[in-house]
Amino acid sequence: AGSSEAGSSAAEATGDKVITVGASPSPHAEILEAAKDALKAEGYELKVVEYTDYVQPNLALESKSLDANYFQHLPYLENFNKERGTKLVSVAAIHYEPFGIYAGKSKDLKNLPDGAKIAVPNDVTNEARALLLLADQGLITLKDNTDINATKQDIVENPHKIEIVEVEAAQVPRSLQDVDFGVVNGNFAIASGLKVADALATEAADSVAAKTYANIVVVREGDENSEKTQALVKALTTAEIKQFIENKYQGAVVPIF
């Protein structure tokens, strides 16, 4: 009996050294893979479980199949908690995927033709980000205190009489041939072969959008200061990971730590 008891306590000790994290395949799982060695050096094995949807990784975390997840931003998490009654919290912001303004029929943002058509995503969250970016570039003026809930109704000045064309987010890259400019989500830009380096303008790292839509590491409430959580956050916020993100994604994914 003595030997098997020793065996089981050793197994428990190693079992406790596995950190299981749910993530979207790109860039989240790729960034986690890059942090594996740093965690190994701390005595932890990192197990990454990939999800292609945005519901299961939160449910799996709530039901304790995962120790953490990394795929979402805070507004999504807060809404999820409200709708599902889950108690999940953010412990670190790792990166954001900047929106960019891309050239369509026109190439020069500074000399905008009057009546220019600009395609933006048509869902609330993404349209607000697009409008904030256009406002940052001085193309339109939004009401004071307009935030991540901005809509077309919040435009107070539009000197160039820009026509905002609302298109499903994934379709904006395709619509570039029909409009003067398009405002494209980082992930859809990458998927459609647009290079962020070619964007005429992108969200600044200190913009409201970058801070709001930073992708976060999430754990169950009460686990914020657990050893596993601290080890995971430490491994994801090193100079090495920062460099990995910058080199691999060339501006399409930007570290925010």
Language model features with spans:
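A bilobed periplasmic-binding-protein/Venus flytrap-type ligand-binding module shared by bacterial periplasmic
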Residues: P98-L109, Y213-S226
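A conserved helix-loop-strand patch within extracytoplasmic ligand-binding domains
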Residues: V91-I140, K242-Q243
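Short helix-initiation/N-cap motifs at beta->coil->alpha
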Residues: V48-L59, D147-R174
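Ligand-binding "clamshell"
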Residues: N79-V91, S106, D178, V183, ...
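Short, low-complexity disordered leader/linker segments with a strong preference
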Residues: A1-V18
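Ligand-binding clefts/hinges and TM-proximal coupling segments of bilobed small-molecule sensing domains
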Residues: T125-N149, Q230-F257
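Alpha-to-beta junction loops
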Residues: E62-Q72, A116, L139, H160-E163, ...
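Short, well-ordered beta-strand elements
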Residues: T14-S26, Y44-E50, K117-I118
